[in-house]
């Protein structure tokens, strides 16, 4: 594993158990894994950027070789270079993810040919989980246990107790 440093990026709005599975698996493959939280300019955030970062940090706190980094704006390859990353880590749930990632990898490789991209297939029972589906469940106050880390559940319960709009 010597010298292999990974970067797994996303908006994590919110972080799901699917994301966590990818992060845990990557932590066994790399000496160090950075998890870069970004804002997606094509999506309006459900949770604030700060709250997403906080929940993600709480979710990965038991993984000693994982560090959450905030990169509100910019390109993943720029952050990867800044952190001396050797590999971008991407998760695939289905063929739609594959098509999207193939296009993204083309541009990442053009911008940073020295950084390799690796793909991890989602664990079968976690493939249906997506942040957008979780947001729908939260909006209707449906149970999310088993779909997201405890940090997300705690935050949603806190907001529901205060009757706040998320």
Curated annotation (Swiss-Prot):
Which Enzyme Commission numbers does its entry carry?
Answer: 2.7.7.3
GO function terms (MF aspect): ATP binding; pantetheine-phosphate adenylyltransferase activity
Instruction: Give the classification, highest ranks.
Output: Bacteria, Bacillati, Bacillota, Bacilli, Lactobacillales
Subcellular localization, as worded in the UniProt entry: Cytoplasm
Provide the residue positions that the database annotates as binding ATP.
11-12, 19, 91-93, 101, 126-132
- For the ligand (substrate), the binding residues are 11, 43, 76, 90
Q: Which reaction does it catalyse?
A: (R)-4'-phosphopantetheine + ATP + H(+) = 3'-dephospho-CoA + diphosphate
Q: Which Pfam families match?
A: CTP_transf_like
Q: Where is this site: Transition state stabilizer?
A: 19
Name-wise, this protein is Phosphopantetheine adenylyltransferase
Species for this entry: Streptococcus equi subsp. zooepidemicus (strain H70)
Task: Indicate the quaternary assembly.
Answer: Homohexamer.
């Amino acid at each position: 594993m010597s010298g292999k440093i990974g970067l797994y990026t996303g908006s994590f709005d919110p972080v799901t158990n699917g994301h966590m599975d990818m992060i845990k698996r990557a932590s066994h493959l790399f000496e160090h894994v950075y998890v870069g939280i970004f804002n997606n300019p094509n999506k309006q955030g459900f949770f604030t950027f700060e709250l997403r970062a906080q929940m993600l940090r709480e979710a990965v706190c038991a993984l000693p070789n994982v560090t959450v980094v905030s990169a509100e704006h910019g390109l993943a390859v720029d952050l990867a270079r800044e952190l001396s990353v050797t590999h971008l880590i991407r998760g695939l749930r289905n063929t739609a993810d594959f098509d999207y990632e193939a296009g993204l990898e083309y541009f990442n490789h053009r911008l940073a040919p020295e950084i390799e991209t690796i793909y991890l297939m989602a664990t079968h029972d976690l493939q249906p989980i997506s942040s957008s589906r979780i947001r729908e469940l939260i909006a209707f106050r449906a149970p999310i246990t088993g779909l997201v880390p405890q940090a997300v559940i705690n935050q949603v319960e806190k907001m529901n107790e205060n009757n706040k709009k998320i």
